[in-house]
Each structure stands twice: as C-alpha cells, then as structure tokens.
Amino acid sequence: MSKRPYCIGEGLKKGAWTTEEDKKLISYIHDHGEGGWRDIPEKAGLKRCGKSCRLRWTNYLKPDIKRGEFSYEEEQIIIMLHASRGNKWSVIARHLPKRTDNEVKNYWNTHLKKRLIDDGIDPVTHKPLASSNPNPVEPMKFDFQKKSNQDEHSSQSSSTTPASLPLSSNLNSVKSKISSGETQIESGHVSCKKRFGRSSSTSRLLNKVAARASSIGNILSTSIEGTLRSPASSSGLPDSFSQSYEYMIDNKEDLGTSIDLNIPEYDFPQFLEQLINDDDENENIVGPEQDLLMSDFPSTFVDEDDILGDITSWSTYLLDHPNFMYESDQDSDEKNFL
C-alpha cells in the first residue's frame, strides 16, 4: 500500500507565504507539535501542500534557527563536506548546528561557489582549473646578441686595463706561462737528479774506500798486538826476550811508529784519479739516472793486501781531494725530492 501524497485536491496555493499563513502554522504547531505534515494544512486551515508547510516551518518559522552571516569555520566545513559528499545539503546541515539545509544550499550557490572559481578551483571536483591562469607569464628570453654588444662596448671602454685583452690571448698567455714553468721544473729536476747521481756515486765510492782502509788498519793493528802478546805466556822464550817484550808492551804508543811492516807504499792518488775517470765513463754509459756501485768496477783496480801502505796519508788525501764530498743535508733533501 503506497503512501498518500502530500498535495491532493485542487485549488492549492503556491508561491510566497503571507503573514497570516505563517501565524496559522505557528499557532497549530505550538498547540499540536510537529509531525503529520500531510494533515496539518487541513487542520490548520491552510490551502497549502503538506511539504510546503514542513519546509516553511523548518527553514523559516522554527524559533531556534540561526540567522545571519556564516562564520569562517562554517564555510570551511561546508567546503570540505561538499568535496566529499557533493550536493547532499541535508547531510551537510547536520554538521552545522541551527543551520538549515536550504540555507546551506543558498549560501553555497551565492557565495562559496563563486569564491572557489575566482581562486582557480573547480567547485565540482575541488581541483585546480586547467585555465586557472589566463595570463601565464612567458619565460624570459635572453638576448645573446644584445649581451655580446654590451660586453664589447664595456671591453672597448676599459681597453687600458688587462681585462680588455681578448679571452683567447689571455688563455694563450696563461698556457705559455704554465708550459714554460713546467719546462723549467722538468729541466731543473733532470739537472738536479743528474748532478746528485754523479756526486752521490763518487762520494759513496770514496767513503767506501776510506772505510775499507780504516777497517783493514784496525784488523792489522789488532793482529799485530795479539801476535806480540801471545809469546808472553810461553815459558820457552829466553828471559832477555821476555823483558824486552814487556818493555815494548809498556811503551806500545811508540810501537806503531817503530815497527816497520815492510809493506810497499801504494800510490793511492793515482788509484783515486783512475777511479774517478772510470766513474765518469761508466756514468756516460749507464745514463745520469742510474747509480754506480762498487761492483761495477773491475776487481783489478784495488788490491786489498797492498792498499794499506800508509793509512794516515790516505785519509789526508781523501779529505783534501776536491772531488771528495760528504753527504750533506742538501743531498738528503734532493733524495726526498726525487
């Protein structure tokens, strides 16, 4: 069984409500309360539809209805609920106390909808409009020709300064300076390395010869002293020889100068000159960057048995020789540099 429609019969009034109609409706609802909207028009003596009476009471005549401007918070609630629920005004009005759905709908259509369009937002989808920026800012174009002309004018006005030189000439000058500096550094490095290789090899050879001569002298003096001391313990020697030997031991400071070892004197200066000449020849053969070792020389140059002729004269000659060089701090710095 279907419901009875709100409006039946003929001669129903439509349009704006009058003051008399409003008073009749208010008086009946105060006496009988809300509800039964299909029967209210007949009972209240109104020639109106039941739906029209309900809407008139709910939206206008109800005493607790909130009138006036919508606050900022109410506007934000309407916008957010409309984005999620759409045009369901009764649902939106439930979240706004004392606000009717009709009032919310009217306020949306007259205020909020136009405001969103002005802000570039679609009132239906609540997304930015495609043509939200009718006058887009064109990208700034850079005029390279104008910029080059300005640079040329500024370079001509400051022709007396070094900055007015062409860029290519500045680059060429910088490259030439860098290349010349690299050439000087490389040449200095090679010459320093060559000089260090020559001087260090000669000094090592001379120092090795001096150290060898000194060690042989120490060994020989020790062996002579041991030979002279060994007969002192034997009992088969005559007393006269032992007494003379004890006297020699007591005066051993004169022993080194009084004993003739019968070792032929070796011509060390001639040996050293020959050694230096051979060093120069070997350096020219192997190149400036290779060091010469004692093993590179023939073993026939030095006789270890005859090299101990006069140790004192050898040391003096080594110290006085112009090509004899000690390994100084400068040589060690050059090693670190290499």
Swiss-Prot record:
The gene is MYB76. Residues 123-171, 176-195 are annotated as: Disordered. GO terms for biological process: regulation of glucosinolate biosynthetic process; response to insect; response to water deprivation; response to wounding. One of its GO terms (cellular component) is nucleus. Induction: Slightly induced by auxin (IAA) and jasmonic acid (JA). Accumulates upon mechanical stimuli (e.g. wounding) in inflorescence. Down-regulated by sulfur-deficient stress. It comes from the Eukaryota. One of its GO terms (molecular function) is DNA-binding transcription factor activity. Its main location: nucleus. Residues 155-171 have a biased composition (Low complexity). Signal peptide: none annotated. The keyword Lyase does not apply. This is Transcription factor MYB76. InterPro entries: Homeodomain-like_sf (IPR009057), Myb_dom (IPR017930), Myb_TF_plants (IPR015495), SANT/Myb (IPR001005). Expressed in both vegetative and generative organs. Mostly present in inflorescences, flowers and seedlings, in the transition zone between roots and the foliar part, and stems, and, to a lower extent, in leaves (in midvein and trichomes). Plays a role in determining the spatial distribution of aliphatic glucosinolates (AGLSs) within the leaf, mostly short chained. Together with MYB28/HAG1 and MYB29/HAG3, promotes aliphatic glucosinolate biosynthesis and represses indolic glucosinolate biosynthesis, but could not activate AGSL biosynthesis on its own. Transmembrane segments: none annotated. Pfam families: Myb_DNA-binding (PF00249).
